[in-house]
């Protein structure tokens, strides 16, 4: 028996089954059909019949008089009245093999009669609830088969919403169905006569018929879809596939918290319980749970490791189009999917004049402009985003869209948008909505509640903790905060009781705005990694003896809070997917307290937009694509360089829109996986090896669209090759070359960071983020001699101990997780849930912007030459030149022009119309732009106060023609994962 709690949204129950191909999969059920024709011989109506053998005849079971059915539901043959029965011609009777039923309904959501039981053998079920349960059934993948010793899985979905409707149609559970003891029970009805009202509904008929027609061409047996359905239920019931269900009341609650480290490439989450029925309970880290993301298309697949931030618009109905008839049930209002499901949906989407997927919304927090192309939903049945028959785009105007404006912001007018031209920044809100729905489903899942104890208590989300990159711009911090608040608002609109009425988003104790001069975000990623290290050392390894930790790890320093006591200065280099962050903090303990309070003092912080995804791109450009070139030339192909540049380079004038779609798919579905394999190679091998692309894709998922045939066709045609098999291409996994590619992108960053680490006399260097696992990166830090190797700690090799939520026997394979764990520790300390560790983060609120110097970025978008500086440190006005082309303006922290800069603004014409308008005026280039920055916000340039004069000194009315666009993405308006463009060189000839 499984207990669900009322009003906890859609709840999933998984039932593993082991069904061998040799199994009989038999059902004793047999069927016949009655078709009624009109006077013209046209089919008018019909029904499915259930033959019962009586004497030498077969009769329809439903025609047997009630007196001939005993209290157990069995037939009393001698009581059958011949004047009631309907005789069935034996030749019309048929059976359905179990394998056929499996093949028809596998991989589909179908309705399921899970009715309330009653203590009456002749009528063992109430007539409902009808619409609260759906089932998905299918074969599991090989990994799951080995892990769980199962071949198939049933996934039951229950909509636990209850209503006050004792007298009406019994469609949803009533309030009275939920009890504190769970003594009201629900079971799946298998015998057809007990759920005739259920399956005879026209919408159920359409639902099942639509699925059947996808798999089978009907030649006869008009109601065979029903026969398959009944046989499927019978066989799964024989396999004990349908547990008994109880519904508990929702009056007892436990508060939970959600900790999120939202990355450009991946996101990591933890769920914790912050209250307990038992008073004065301290927190046990082993009780925290990893956030799970369920694949709603393949619902038995649940991922609890850090998940991809790829997003794809998709509507989940838990059924086919016929399920639209069922109103106000199974509402999953999220607009998009994330993680592995989004990656898979991206692989089947091909549309030339619309969009449905994006690599990461966090990269586009700066872009609040309305999209020129509409967002449409991916057709999850594989029809490439369009209705198969009508070629009709399905706009993303479902679910939470009723509360949105056209640009994706929350509507205050009450009128929903009719167009899905959402800004790219708004997709951050949509992604957070999906994450919240996934978390809310997880915390009330029966397995979660059973694991945590107090399983009869409803879990309610009270706290959300969010981290951010250490050097994230102030505006992006504001935008991220607004996205979180909008997501919470949208979830509350749909499920008002799912979130605590006093829900808090941390670390925002107070409202923040663009006018704030200090950064509000205490939970920065690099500092959180340091907190994880401190907790592990002080509590786990030094057993709470804080003074010993500082004695053995630190030293006495003059300029500290307590000069007479040891302090530890820790540097963290966090190499994520999109940014590399440095945080140098000095830590001391205030020993006056019974439990020493750790006080971090930030010393230096910095962040660069160069990280793991840039490493992947460089490996593709230095290793993967040159292997393509070499292979094609060995096959005696001609025009190889031109062909590869056409396929994988920048946009060219002779390329169709479909080509650019395939180029993006190649980047994400082929090249990226090949780069991952190269990274795996250098982590595990020193010997050079060659592998075909076919060998690589024995591990990674093959593209399911037309990408491979398209590439093969272009290469055969342009390279004049009679035959070409894409999967035969040899990739040269040369260890030295792969490491060279990694170092080429990351060494300039390491060189700058190690100088600072040496200047600030650090005691420990922590390397966090998944890319820090690369041996070449640690080697670069060791070669700098800034610290002895024993003081350089790579979290990928660090022994945390069994307390760590993501540890496997104390080891952590993915350093990405240290950020969310550190944020959890800091949060628990702030609410006094830790008995051996306290940390005061107040000093971190003084971390301000690193935008000391603003200037025009160089051509490679990574440096600002001194001659191109606009505003220097402690200065508030400057000039730059405009020659008619967009000007990229960036920021850096230090006075050296070799210091890596970050993109901040683009100065350009408002649009082509205003450019043409100005061209009609009598002005000459170059223009000189004088601009000021806000004295209270170092990042803010004031376009309203700019002065523009042309070459001859004539003043131009700038506000009429120009805009200053806040933009943190360098080099174009799209990230390489979103446009698929690579820099190609003829490496094989060098």
Residue ranges, per PLM feature:
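Phosphate/oxyanion-binding active-site loops and adjacent basic polyanion-contact surfaces
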Residues: 222-232, 353-357, 419-443, 473-480, ...
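Phosphate/ATP-binding catalytic cores across multiple sugar-kinase/actin-like superfamilies
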Residues: 234-253, 427-456, 530-563, 713-761, ...
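Acidic, glycine/GT-rich loop-and beta-edge segments that sit at the periphery of enzyme/chaperone cores
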Residues: 22-33, 218-223, 544-553, 562-564, ...
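Conserved phosphate-binding/catalytic loops in two-lobed NTP-binding clefts
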Residues: 489-524, 528, 782-818
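Phosphate-binding glycine-rich/basic clefts of nucleotide- and phosphate-handling proteins
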Residues: 281-377, 381-384, 584-721, 832-906
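Glycine-rich phosphate-binding loop of actin/hexokinase-like ATP-binding domains
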Residues: 260-301, 524-528, 533-627, 862-863
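Glycine-rich phosphate-binding loops at beta-strand->alpha-helix junctions
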Residues: 458, 463-479, 762-781
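Early-domain small/polar-rich strand-loop-helix modules and first-structured segments
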Residues: 1-398, 611, 615-618, 623-627, ...
């Amino acid at each position: 028996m499984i207990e669900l709690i009322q009003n906890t949204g859609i709840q999933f129950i998984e039932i593993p089954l082991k069904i061998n191909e040799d199994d009989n999969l038999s059902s004793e059920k047999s069927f016949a059909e009655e078709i009624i024709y009109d006077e013209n011989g046209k089919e008018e109506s019909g029904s499915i019949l259930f033959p019962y053998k009586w004497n030498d005849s077969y009769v329809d079971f439903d025609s047997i008089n009630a007196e001939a059915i005993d209290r157990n539901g069995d037939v009393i043959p001698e009581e059958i009245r011949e004047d009631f029965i309907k005789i069935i011609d034996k030749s019309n009777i048929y059976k359905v093999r179990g394998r056929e039923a499996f093949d028809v309904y596998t991989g589909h959501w179908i309705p399921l009669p899970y009715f309330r039981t009653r203590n009456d053998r002749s009528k063992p079920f109430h007539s409902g609830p009808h619409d609260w349960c759906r089932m998905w059934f299918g074969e599991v993948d090989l990994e799951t088969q080995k892990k769980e010793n199962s071949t198939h899985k049933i996934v039951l979905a229950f909509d636990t919403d209850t209503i006050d409707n004792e007298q009406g149609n019994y469609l949803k559970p009533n309030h009275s169905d939920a009890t504190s003891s769970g003594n009201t029970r629900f079971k799946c009805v298998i015998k057809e006569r007990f759920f005739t009202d259920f399956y005879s509904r026209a919408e159920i008929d359409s639902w099942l018929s639509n699925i059947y027609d996808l798999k089978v061409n009907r030649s006869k047996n008009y109601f065979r879809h029903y026969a398959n359905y009944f046989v499927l239920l019978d066989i799964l019931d024989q396999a004990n596939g349908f547990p008994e269900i109880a519904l508990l009341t929702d009056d007892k609650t436990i508060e939970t918290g959600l900790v999120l480290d939202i990355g450009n490439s991946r996101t990591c989450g933890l769920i914790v319980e912050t209250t307990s029925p038992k008073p004065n309970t301290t927190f046990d880290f082993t009780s925290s749970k990893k956030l799970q993301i369920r694949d709603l298309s393949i619902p038995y697949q649940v991922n609890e490791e850090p998940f991809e931030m790829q997003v794809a618009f998709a509507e989940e109905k838990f059924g086919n189009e016929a399920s639209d008839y069922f109103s106000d049930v199974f509402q999953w209002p999220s607009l998009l999917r994330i993680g592995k499901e989004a990656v898979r949906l991206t692989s089947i989407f091909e549309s030339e004049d619309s969009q449905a997927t994006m690599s990461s919304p966090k990269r586009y927090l700066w872009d609040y402009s309305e999209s020129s192309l509409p967002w449409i939903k991916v057709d999850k049945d594989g029809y490439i985003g369009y209705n198969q028959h009508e070629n009709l785009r399905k706009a993303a105007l479902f679910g939470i869209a009723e509360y949105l404006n056209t640009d994706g912001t929350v509507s205050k007018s009450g009128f929903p948008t009719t167009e899905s031209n959402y800004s790219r920044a708004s997709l951050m809100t949509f992604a957070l909505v999906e994450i919240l729905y996934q978390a809310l489903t997880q915390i009330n899942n029966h397995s979660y509640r059973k694991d945590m104890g107090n399983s009869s208590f409803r879990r309610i989300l009270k706290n959300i903790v969010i981290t951010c990159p250490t050097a994230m711009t102030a505006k992006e911090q504001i935008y991220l905060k607004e996205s979180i608040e909008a997501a919470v608002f949208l979830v509350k609109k749909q499920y008002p009781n799912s979130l605590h009425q006093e829900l808090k988003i941390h670390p925002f104790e107070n409202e923040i705005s663009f006018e704030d001069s200090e950064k509000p975000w205490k939970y920065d990623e690099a500092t959180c990694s340091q907190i994880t290290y401190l907790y592990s050392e002080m509590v786990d390894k030094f057993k709470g003896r804080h003074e010993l930790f500082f004695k053995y790890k630190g030293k006495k320093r003059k300029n500290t809070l307590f000069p007479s006591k040891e302090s530890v200065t820790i540097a963290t280099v966090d190499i994520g997917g999109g940014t590399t962050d440095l945080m140098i903090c000095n830590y001391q303990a205030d020993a006056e307290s019974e439990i020493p309070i750790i006080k971090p003092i930030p010393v230096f912080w910095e962040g660069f937009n160069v990280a793991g995804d840039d490493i992947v791109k460089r490996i593709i450009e230095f290793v993967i694509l040159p292997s393509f070139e070499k292979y094609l030339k060995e096959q005696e192909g001609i025009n190889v360089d031109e062909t590869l540049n056409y396929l994988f380079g920048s946009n060219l004038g002779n390329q169709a829109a479909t080509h650019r779609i395939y180029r993006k798919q190649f980047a994400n579905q082929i090249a990226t996986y090949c780069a991952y394999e190269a990274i795996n190679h250098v982590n595990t091998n020193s010997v050079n090896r060659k592998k075909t692309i076919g060998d690589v894709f024995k591990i990674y998922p093959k593209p399911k669209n037309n990408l491979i045939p398209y590439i093969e066709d272009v290469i055969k045609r342009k390279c004049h090759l009679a035959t070409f098999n894409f999967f035969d291409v040899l990739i040269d996994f040369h260890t030295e070359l792969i490491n060279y590619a990694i170092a080429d992108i990351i060494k300039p960053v390491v060189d700058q960071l190690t100088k600072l680490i040496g200047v600030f006399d650090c005691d420990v260097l922590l390397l966090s983020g998944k890319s820090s696992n690369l041996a070449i990166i640690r080697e670069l830090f060791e070669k700098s001699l800034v610290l002895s190797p024993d003081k350089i700690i790579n979290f990928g090799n660090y022994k945390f101990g069994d307390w760590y939520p993501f540890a496997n026997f104390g080891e952590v394979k993915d350093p990405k997780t240290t950020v969310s764990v550190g944020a959890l520790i800091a949060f628990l300390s702030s609410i006094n849930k830790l008995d051996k560790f306290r940390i005061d983060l107040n000093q971190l609120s003084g971390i301000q912007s690193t935008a000391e110097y603003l200037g025009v970025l160089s051509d490679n978008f990574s440096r600002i030459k001194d001659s191109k500086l606009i505003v220097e440190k402690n200065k508030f006005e400057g000039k730059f030149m405009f020659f008619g082309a967009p000007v990229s303006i960036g920021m850096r922290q230090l006075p050296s022009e070799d210091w890596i800069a970050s993109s901040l603004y683009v100065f350009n014409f408002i649009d082509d119309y205003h450019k043409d308008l100005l061209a009609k005026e009598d002005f000459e280039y170059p223009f000189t732009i004088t601009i000021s920055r806000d004295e209270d916000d170092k990042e803010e340039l004031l376009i309203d106060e700019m002065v523009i004069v042309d070459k001859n000194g004539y003043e131009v009315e700038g506000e009429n023609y120009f805009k200053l666009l806040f933009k943190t993405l360098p080099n174009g308006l799209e990230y390489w994962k979103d446009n698929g463009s690579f820099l190609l060189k003829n490496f094989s000839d060098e």
